[in-house]
Amino acid sequence: MDRLNSQDRFARLDWTRIAAELDAEGHALLLQLLTADESRALAREAAAASGLPPCVQAWRPVLYGHLLALANRWREHMGMQPGLPSRFEDFMRQGRQAGQTQPQPQPQPHLLRVPQAGHAPLRSYSEGAAVFPLQLVLLLCRPGQDFEGGEFVMTEQRPRMQSRPMVLPLGLGDAAIIATGPRPVRGAAGFYRVHLRHAISRVHRGEWLGLELLLHDAPSAPKALQTDRWL
């Protein structure tokens, strides 16, 4: 799994395009981030691990570096100060000092498993003082072969408007960068906040297996994890 540690897979991405799509929609697809073989190998390793696999742990500071400018711009547009630290290690230290020591999601950090007839309810990860507004999701199984149903769904709630649903068409090895919760949207009178949540619809056959990589930890008793469970 050493090749999964490589920073090259992220360095070769079009981060200008990714930032533009995140500004416009709150999500950006990363098609074929992993090959089929890499996806299967990572699925086996993630299922056997008690936490985040080491090969993916190395992705966190890399993603942080690529997304930091956008994250700080979002914070500024939402009236949040001060800016995030330039180093991922310093950001994590801020979280620990604020009591954010709980890996997420639970019950198995970072691994998403939704069995047949199950679904994942709408949720977001915006609890705590040190929150990074973006995260990665990655599909480790093949739609139509390993499972049926199980669409990755996002909803965007805007002030005084109906919620906007979105379906992300993920395939084996595809990833997406999505907002963890609030994000700014430019309106006629300036920027305003919208809130995004994500879910996995009912799995009709097989098992949905993926990875959810957050760049911040949760408080010891976060509200989101108490009220929303993977079913």
Positions of PLM-derived features:
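Fe(II)/2-oxoglutarate oxygenase catalytic core
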Residues: 1-231
